[in-house]
Amino acid sequence: MRDYTKQYINGEWVESNSNETIEVINPATEEVIGKVAKGNKADVDKAVEAADNVYLEFRHTSVKERQALLDKIVKEYENRKDDIVQAITDELGAPLSLSERVHYQMGLNHFVAARDALDNYEFEERRGDDLVVKEAIGVSGLITPWNFPTNQTSLKLAAAFAAGSPVVLKPSEETPFAAVILAEIFDKVGVPKGVFNLVNGDGAGVGNPLSEHPKVRMMSFTGSGPTGSKIMEKAAKDFKKVSLELGGKSPYIVLDDVDIKEAAKATTGKVVNNTGQVCTAGTRVLVPNKIKDAFLAELKEQFSQVRVGNPREDGTQVGPIISKKQFDQVQNYINKGIEEGAELFYGGPGKPEGLEKGYFARPTIFINVDNQMTIAQEEIFGPVMSVITYNDLDEAIQIANDTKYGLAGYVIGKDKETLHKVARSIEAGTVEINEAGRKPDLPFGGYKQSGLGREWGDYGIEEFLEVKSIAGYFK
């Protein structure tokens, strides 16, 4: 049982102002595996004050000093690899192999990318007799989601540290353990007091007062659209800068010259990875009518090989949904798809056979889906694929862009000219060609209702900077 009932404020583990705690549930067993403090406004005020007190000092550290700090974090993060992997498997239910290969590694990659970005990043630019300076924005509030406990947290922290901005972090109360380990890492390597502050709690007790605090200069949030909208509303009262990475309903366009087995394998992975709890999941698979039958046959074969089960057993590829609430939401969407006339091709409602305990869902494929159906328009956040057919490329692009979201898109095929045309035509912040993967130094963010701003690498650092013009500096 993990007992993390203290907050990390101003370089020390301190008692929370609140006597309340939040239980953390292992979604694979439905058992309580620990608890964290349920912080309140007083905790937030204390953390913001600590960050504000160190703001000017940290802002004026040199690039080399901040780079050295990030390098120390990278080394200690690597030392805590097993702790991080075990924590994520416990709190998220991710298979051990996924916790190591994806969750742990992505967190590490962001600290490395921010450190390396400082090699060439220009914080000052001369323009004739004038100077343009980029400097730390100040106290930044970070609110991170449960689906990627290290990735989403590390990318924000790494960028803020590289920029010279102190932070107050509120991680998800459903997966808080990884953030506590990060706090331990920062404490050990000597992150200056006040530069990093961790306040555990829920949205009402911590998220709201953090978003509204007058000394917080910017809010960086990853999560749902409705919550992002509320944060924007609260931040608008004193015109805070806001960076939002929100939901998605990403299209995966399969071209007619594709290797069908390769395409079926790729699209399967984009839906079942992390149990479908991925904002960039390619859950709308667009397939040419001319290869539909062959593709579906191979797709069913690929889905049949996916092993759902105990995340601590070798060979498990897909773990549970994060919570009972989220499990029920996924079931509701599956039932909605059936009600609206989509054809259930694989999987369906309920749990996989033999997995009565835990929030396990059946990987599911719907075919004959109309893009206006609920399952094609709303983010399900579970292992549910909608297959939509198209007759020509123009129709595929039209369907792909017929969504309120624009976080990611995918295309797979052989003809380079066609691949490039599709990639340029998809209205999304990130497009992958032939499973190229996203490198941590590329900008990440969304069009339309998928968010504001960009994260990762030097683009992520810029979210934590203000720009100042000094006229006549060189006269």
UniProtKB/Swiss-Prot annotation:
Question: From what superkingdom does this record's organism come?
Answer: Bacteria
Indicate whether Cell inner membrane appears among the record's keywords.
Answer: no
* Keywords, ordered alphabetically: NAD, Oxidoreductase
> What is the E.C. number?
1.2.1.3
Tell me a Gene Ontology molecular-function term this record carries. aldehyde dehydrogenase (NAD+) activity
Q: Do you know which CDD domains this protein is assigned to?
A: ALDH_CddD_SSP0762
Q: Where does NAD(+) bind?
A: 146-147, 223-224, 246, 379
Task: Tell me which residues this entry annotates as catalytic.
Answer: 245 (proton acceptor), 279 (nucleophile)
Query: Which spans of this chain does the record mark as coiled coil?
Result: none
The entry assigns this protein to a family as follows:
Belongs to the aldehyde dehydrogenase family.
Know the name of this protein? Putative aldehyde dehydrogenase
Q: Which organism is it from?
A: Staphylococcus aureus (strain MRSA252)
Which lineage do the record's taxonomy fields give for this organism? Bacteria, Bacillati, Bacillota, Bacilli, Bacillales
